[in-house]
From Swiss-Prot:
The chain crosses the membrane at residues 17-37, 475-495. InterPro entries: FAD/NAD-bd_sf (IPR036188), Squalene_epoxidase (IPR013698), Squalene_monox (IPR040125). Its cofactor is FAD. Residues 1-16, 496 are cytoplasmic. Its EC number is 1.14.14.17. The lineage of its organism: Eukaryota, Fungi, Dikarya, Ascomycota, Saccharomycotina. Interacts with ERG28. SUPFAM superfamilies: FAD/NAD(P)-binding domain (SSF51905). One of its GO terms (cellular component) is lipid droplet. This is Squalene epoxidase ERG1.
Length: 496
């Protein structure tokens, strides 16, 4: 976009002052950081390469934990007037069977925390619009998530940020993180179209440049994600979803996981897992051969139409444990800091929770006291572990089970589904983890291994008395597999 098409306020930011904070990136997390700090009285500069509405297939389903975080930040109305679609739970399909998993009761979890100076004038309540209804979100006995067209949601977040008098916006490409002679971060250099390379100074610089972060390595050269699989996405139009207002997880012994969720009254997103960082060379043929046979009948017409049009979108599935923010004058946050498998839709929830905790920890500090801020950021790293570890480990563990590529993993996949079918706490506890409202890693460990032992029990029952010796051997292998799938990631998240 040339300078003549950019609003003057996006290129004329003052570079003669020292800002309290510079925020690099205006994805989901950047505007929330900027808005929260501005409402705390901080002078904030937020830099974004392109303020036009993006077209992406990431960040389209927000779990209840993310919705609650938006309430805490006083930014929940960002889901309004974009034809966002309510989400009330999940339906899991496995080899033709299905089980419904509704979101938790509000009475079973703590009330939403309202952050001082951020929540005011009812900005923690949704508004009434064509798809989001006050009575559903405010009065329903259960928590709700929400799905939406990502770009529309992002535009709303950015508009909220733009209304803050303490926020200055810049359209430009951040090309360098500035450091002083002590190697402490003091700002950023931005290439602004029509203005050139401009240096901006700040007491604290936030790196929020997302999945493909250019600057996460400022924390450490080895802070890079691993990519083990990918999703191929399509838009289904006017689809007849088997379980309206539910996310759909379609599993089977002979295929990779398939996710389906509605993002507007007309559009439904389908994401098909592929167990390689590189997508198939002939995506259309792969869709017809390896995915189409397992699509529920009601979805087949819209699925077939989407395949025939061939508008496929691919996204990598990355994993990146968080590192300590131990560089004075800098804070890396969001996907730039920490990523997990997108199977469970927990990315925005983790990022928004991080913003809530961040504002609580440093929002009232004087950012010119850089050592004090650094101390709080080090504490913040450990305080965030309780919730980020649950969502991150759950995402990786469930993907391992749902994309089972060995007999032991397939046994655990079947056992997990049968565990859900028991209902009661066998559904209630897992969905609290999935929703991002139960930040208790030890409880997650207990539930995961309850699934493992239930799988062993089912296998013994299936083998019968004569097959008991074989069942015992298989049980040992199933348990070893469960340990290998779960514990390294939990250890890495909690200890790292």
């Amino acid at each position: 976009m040339s300078a003549v098409n950019v609003a003057p306020e996006l290129i004329n930011a003052d570079n003669t002052i020292t800002y309290d904070a510079i925020v690099i990136g205006a994805g989901v997390i950047g505007p929330c950081v900027a808005t929260g700090l501005a409402r705390k009285g901080k002078k904030v500069l937020i830099v974004e390469r392109d303020w036009a509405m993006p077209d992406r297939i990431v960040g389209e389903l927000m779990q209840p934990g993310g919705v609650r975080a938006l309430r805490s930040l006083g930014m929940i109305q960002s889901i309004n007037n974009i034809e966002a679609y309510p989400v009330t739970g999940y339906t899991v399909f496995f080899n033709g069977e299905q089980v419904d998993i509704p979101y938790p009761y509000k009475a079973d979890i703590p009330k939403v925390e309202k952050l001082k100076d951020l929540v005011k004038d009812g900005n923690d309540k949704v508004l009434e619009d064509s798809t989001i209804h006050i009575k559903d979100y405010e009065d329903d006995e259960r928590e709700r998530g929400v799905a939406f067209v990502h770009g529309r949601f992002l535009n709303n977040l950015r508009n909220i940020t733009a209304q803050e008098p303490n926020v200055t916006r810049v359209q430009g490409n951040c090309i360098e993180i500035l450091k002083d002679e002590k190697n402490e971060v003091v700002g950023a250099k931005v290439d602004i179209d029509g203005r050139g390379k401009v240096e901006f100074k700040a007491h604290l610089t936030f790196i929020c440049d997302g999945i493909f972060s250019r600057f996460r390595k400022e924390l450490h050269p080895d802070h890079v994600p691993t990519v083990g699989s990918s999703f191929v996405g399509m838009s289904l139009f006017n689809a007849k979803n088997p379980a309206p207002m539910h996310g759909h997880v379609i599993l089977g012994s002979d295929h990779m996981p398939i996710l389906v969720y509605q993002i507007s009254p007309e559009e439904t997103r389908i994401l098909c897992a592929y167990n390689s960082p590189k997508v198939p060379a002939d995506i259309k043929s792969w869709m017809i051969k390896d995915v189409q046979p397992f699509i529920p009948k009601s979805l087949r017409p819209s699925f077939d139409e989407a395949v025939s049009q061939g508008k496929f979108r691919a996204m990598p599935n990355s994993y990146l444990p968080a590192r300590q923010n131990d560089v004075t004058g800098m804070c890396v946050i969001g996907d730039a800091l920490n990523m997990r498998h997108p199977l469970t839709g927990g990315g925005m929830t983790v990022g928004l929770h991080d913003v809530v905790l961040l504002i609580k920890k440093i929002g009232d500090l004087d950012f010119s006291d850089r050592e004090k801020v650094l101390d709080e950021l080090l504490d913040y790293h450990f305080e965030r572990k309780s919730y980020d570890s649950v969502i991150n480990v759950l995402s990786v563990a469930l993907y391992s089970l749902f994309a089972a590529d060995s007999d032991n993993l397939k046994a655990l996949q079947k056992g997990c589904f049968k565990y859900f079918q028991r209902g009661g706490d066998c559904v209630n506890k897992p969905v609290e983890f999935l929703s991002g409202v139960l930040p208790k890693p030890l409880q997650l460990t207990r539930v995961f291994f309850a699934v493992a032992f239930y799988t062993i029990y089912l296998n013994m029952e299936e083998r019968g008395f004569l097959g008991l010796p074989m069942a015992l051997l298989e049980g040992i292998m199933i348990l070893i597999t469960a340990i290998r799938v779960f514990t390294p990631f939990l250890f890495g998240e909690l200890i790292g």
